[in-house]
Regions:
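Active-site nucleotide/adenylate-binding loops and adjacent lid/helix of ATP-dependent enzymes
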Residues: 14-19, 51-53, 57-62, 101-196
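ATP-binding N-terminal substructure of ATP-dependent carboxylate-amine bond-forming enzymes
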Residues: 1-99, 103-105, 109-112, 128-139, ...
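A glycine- and small-aliphatic-rich helix-loop capping segment at beta-alpha/alpha-beta transitions
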Residues: 84-93, 169, 174, 304-305
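ATP-dependent carboxylate activation and anion-phosphoryl transfer catalytic cores
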Residues: 244-334
């Protein structure tokens, strides 16, 4: 097995790309270099790694890997499932472990952890699909009385802004909850932040993480939804974001605090909402497997911080090997 100090360029790695149908399309759009990606095909045996026509295919049997670099979005990819598989296989992998991945995917669980750590989050309500189906009126009243309008409605366990809606009145709220319930049994309803600016910050490291300069997403639509992310080019980015020095340092501090709160490792992109009217900063969510092309926000924020894309990849592989080596030193029985 290769050591972290060895030359990263000599390591043998695999990138995993798959996930549920709802987020697979987003992955293929976000990672256009598809001919170099290995795809796990659910219709075949787990031994086989297959790719779409013309793409690279390989089999696990006989394939020696030093490290796995998951670039999967959505359920089974970034919720701790594939991370658990790699733990069982005792294979080093880039990024968050099982716990951080599962908490990072579940928006309701994530908010509970952030609140317990005293991190600033907007008001929210969790709705269970079962309760919604039993008594829509009671749920509607509870949500409106606590949060008012407008609100954002999200499936708790889904990525790429799939199933997210903004509701400005009761009719839209009912429609939004019904849509989110198509994707998850648990729905998160959040109070909208007035005149919100969407600020992001990249975090890199294991037990001593560092934060990049923040960047800003300026959506071409009312908010940064699935279409704005993947299907049109009206949104733009500003890196570094136009912020005061104090705001920049607070965002970087909170990004690291959020990373540590869920025991994250390797990488994460932490998303914030900055209220335009008051300047109040809210922690929105943490993404344990952010988009990772050369033009993605995560890599661009690190590039603006002085870390090139090749060196970023090298660093993440080194962190994965370091984390795995630490685990090998731990006792698992008395």
């Amino acid at each position: 097995m290769m050591k972290a100090a060895d030359t990263i360029a000599d390591s043998r790695g695999a990138r995993l790309q798959s996930g549920e149908t709802e987020t697979r399309e987003a992955h293929l759009v976000a990672h256009p270099g598809g001919d170099t990606l290995l795809t796990i095909d659910p219709s075949t045996r787990s031994e086989e790694l297959s790719a779409r026509s013309g793409q690279v295919a390989a089999t696990v049997s006989g394939l020696t890997l030093d490290v796995v670099f998951p670039v999967l979005h959505g359920p089974y990819g970034e919720d701790g499932t594939v991370q658990g598989l790699l733990e069982l296989a005792n294979v080093p992998y880039v990024g968050a472990g099982v716990l951080a991945s599962s908490v990072g995917m579940d928006k309701a669980a994530m908010k509970l952890v952030f609140a317990a750590k005293g991190l600033p989050i907007c008001d929210y309500e969790v709705v269970l699909k079962r309760d919604w189906q039993r008594d829509e009126r009671a749920i509607m009243n509870a949500v409106v009385n606590k949060l008012g309008f407008p609100v954002f409605v999200k499936p708790a366990n889904l990525g790429s802004s799939v199933g997210i809606s903004k509701a400005k009145h009761a009719t839209e709220l009912r429609t939004a909850i019904n849509l989110a319930a198509e994707f998850d049994r648990k729905i998160v309803v959040e109070a909208a932040v007035p005149q919100a600016r969407e600020i992001e910050c990249a975090v890199l490291g294991n037990d001593e993480p560092e934060a990049s300069v923040p960047g800003e997403i300026i959506p071409g639509r009312e908010f940064y939804d699935y279409e704005a992310k993947y299907l049109d080019d009206t949104s733009r980015t500003v890196i570094p974001a136009t912020l005061t020095e104090r705001q920049t340092e607070e965002i970087r501090r909170l990004a690291i605090a959020a990373f540590r709160a869920i025991d994250c490792a390797g990488m994460a992109r932490v998303d914030f909402l900055l209220a335009g009217d008051s300047g109040v900063l809210y922690l929105n969510e943490l993404n344990t497997i952010p988009g990772f092309t050369t033009i993605s926000m995560y890599s661009k924020m690190w590039e603006a911080s002085g870390l090139s894309y090749p060196k970023l990849v090298d660093k993440l592989i080194a962190l994965a090997l370091e984390r795995h080596a630490e685990k090998q030193q731990l006792r698992t029985s008395m």
